[in-house]
From Swiss-Prot:
The modification Phosphoserine is found at S64. The active site is at S64 (phosphoserine intermediate). This is Phosphoacetylglucosamine mutase. The lineage of its organism: Eukaryota, Metazoa, Chordata, Craniata, Vertebrata. Changing D502Y: In IMD23; decreased function in U UDP-N-acetylglucosamine biosynthetic process; no effect on protein abundance. Substrate binds at E370, A371, N372, R496, P497, S498, G499, T500, R505. One of its GO terms (biological process) is UDP-N-acetylglucosamine biosynthetic process. PANTHER family: PHOSPHOACETYLGLUCOSAMINE MUTASE (PTHR45955:SF1). Keywords: Acetylation, Carbohydrate metabolism, Disease variant, Isomerase, Magnesium, Metal-binding, Phosphoprotein. Its EC number is 5.4.2.3. Mg(2+) binds at S64, D276, D278, D280. One of its GO terms (molecular function) is magnesium ion binding. The modification N-acetylmethionine is found at M1. Catalyzes the conversion of GlcNAc-6-P into GlcNAc-1-P during the synthesis of uridine diphosphate/UDP-GlcNAc, a sugar nucleotide critical to multiple glycosylation pathways including protein N- and O-glycosylation.
Length: 542
């Protein structure tokens, strides 16, 4: 390790005084002008991680659904998954080190993780369309090269495409070709094969309006659309030509405001979807004949996908264990429908994609989606081999179902939640089942719910268990919540500390919006009283 060169280069990417950042679920995120030193240092860290794992590591420059003036960075581990927790700590430590401590921190990490510094390193880099992203990704490259790492800069990519590239490179091409054409071809081939088998390929299935959040999704969907155009025609809105990234558009805006994005005219019963800024989340929506807006979120996407997979397995005659993974935020109606109607087991984990992904890996087939529209399906290697064999060996009807499943497996991006891949999966399933967007929406009716935030002096006074559904501290809070829940039909409520600010998040659902609102307010008051609320007491009325 050439410590002199590192010190010299590090001075060119100096850390602003007093800036402290934390590597969270989404990596580092803050205002773009504060990130130059972090990018350089993540280039260094990616090289160490690559040497330690003897694998290609990814670095993605993006801040997803944050405003355009923000940026961020996250590292991608060898199988396309998120960075290992112990390395998240190293990332935080390295990003916050003062200039004079940089050498010591790098040596510490190398020793702690038994990194062989003679080992070759290879890093792949991708970035989104933010004005600051190109310069910041150059800082990552500086970090990689000063530590003697090799790199490939993919330039503009969606976040899930970078996860895919890393996965392909570390599986010797078995998962796919690690090029953008390889990605387009793999997904499109599977999609076109599937839609060929749809009996109802009328025009209403073939067109879709897509809000691209003025982000990278527009660029990549435009490059890709001619590959799958015989199965689907997409109309792109908020394509970045004039609007601002994530401003009044994108999956996050649509979900939180419960209304369509700016700049998209919707006729009644037209199928529409929105990506987020880096195209790893997707939500669907439509207007009914009365002009009412209907959102189809991650819960309903997971339900459509897992129901379809279950039906195919039954048809093939395979009894594989399939599981759906949700968080406490999943609507109670979706959980009931999956367990009682579809007889698919549902598991709950803590909030955060890495927890869901990890749990989903425990099943032959694991489907996970957060309500915000981030998710995918994972298939064990044994299942993939079994399905391939079935697609070649079984007789007609069973073979057709096995072939469908084989194509669906290829259509999923198993490295990460991917808006483009998920969109094609959903479109294929709707066409194959002959479902309209309203029929999909009508699988079950969401229970009315309300989410609130309560300001507290210190969010750490709240600790939870049972996948964040029960409060352990402060004493008496869970008992108070239990008593309040008993007052309303079909109700539940939970509280959890925010991961980023001193607030406590409250979720409540019940059989009517009025009851859900009352319950959420009463739980907020209990939090305010028992968990050190500050400022004004929570007021009723929304």
């Amino acid at each position: 390790m050439d410590l002199g060169a590192i010190t010299k280069y590090s001075a060119l990417h100096a850390k602003p005084n007093g800036l402290i950042l934390q590597y969270g679920t989404a990596g580092f995120r803050t205002k773009a002008e504060h990130l130059d030193h972090v990018m350089f240092r993540m280039g260094l860290l990616a090289v160490l991680r690559s040497k330690q794992t003897k694998s290609t590591i990814g670095v993605m420059v993006t801040a997803s659904h944050n405003p355009e003036e923000d940026n961020g960075v996250k590292l991608v581990d060898p199988l396309g998954e998120m960075l290992a927790p112990s390395w998240e700590e190293h990332a935080t430590c390295l990003a916050n080190a003062e200039e004079q401590d940089m050498q010591r921190v790098l040596i510490d990490i190398s020793e702690k993780e038994a990194v062989n510094l003679q080992q070759d390193a290879f890093v792949v880099i991708g970035r989104d369309t933010r004005p600051s992203s190109e310069k910041l990704s150059q800082s990552v490259i500086d970090g990689v090269t000063v530590l003697g790492g090799q790199f490939h800069d993919y330039g503009l990519l969606t976040t899930p495409q970078l996860h895919y590239m890393v996965y392909c490179r570390n599986t010797g091409g078995r998962y796919g070709k690690a090029t953008i054409e390889g990605y387009y071809q793999k997904l499109s081939k599977a999609f076109v094969e599937l839609t060929k088998q749809a009996s109802c390929s009328g025009d209403e299935y073939r067109s879709l309006k897509v809000d691209c959040a003025n982000g990278i999704g527009a660029l990549k969907l435009r490059e890709m659309e001619h590959y799958f155009s015989q199965g689907l025609s997409v109309q792109l809105f908020n394509d970045g030509s004039k609007g601002k990234l994530n401003h009044l558009c994108g999956a996050d805006f649509v979900k939180s405001h419960q209304k369509p994005p700016q700049g998209m005219e919707i006729k009644s019963n037209e199928r529409c979807c929105s990506f987020d800024g880096d195209a790893d989340r997707i939500v669907y929506y439509y207007h009914d004949a009365d002009g009412h807006f209907h959102l189809i979120d991650g819960d309903k996407i997971a339900t459509l996908i897992s129901s379809f997979l279950k039906e195919l397995l039954v048809e093939i005659g395979e009894s594989l264990n399939i599981g759906v993974v949700q968080t406490a935020y999943a609507n109670g109606s979706s959980t009931r429908y999956l367990e009682e109607v579809m007889k698919v087991p549902v598991y709950c984990t803590k909030t955060g994609v890495k927890h869901l992904h990890h749990k989903a890996q425990e099943f032959d087939i694991g489907v996970y989606f957060e309500a915000n529209g981030h998710g995918t399906a994972l298939f064990s290697t044994a299942v993939e081999m079994k399905i391939k064999q079935s697609a070649e060996q079984l007789e007609d009807k069973k073979r057709k179902a096995a072939k469908m499943l084989e194509n669906i497996i290829d259509l999923f991006n198993q490295a990460a939640g991917d808006a483009i891949s998920d969109m094609l999966v959903i479109e294929a399933i709707l066409a194959l089942k002959g479902l309209t967007v309203q029929q999909w929406d009508a699988l079950y009716t969401d229970l009315p719910n309300r989410q609130l935030k309560v300001q507290v002096a210190d969010r750490r006074v709240i600790s939870t268990t049972d996948a964040e559904r029960q409060a352990v501290t402060p004493p008496g809070l869970q008992e108070a919540i239990n008593d309040l829940v008993k007052k309303y039909k079909l109700s539940r409520a939970f509280v959890r500390p925010s991961g980023t600010e001193d607030v406590v998040r409250v979720y409540a659902e019940a059989d009517s919006q009025e009851s859900a609102d009352h319950l959420a307010h009463e739980v907020s008051l209990a939090v305010f009283q028992l968990a050190g609320g500050i400022g004004e007491r929570p007021q009723p009325g929304f």
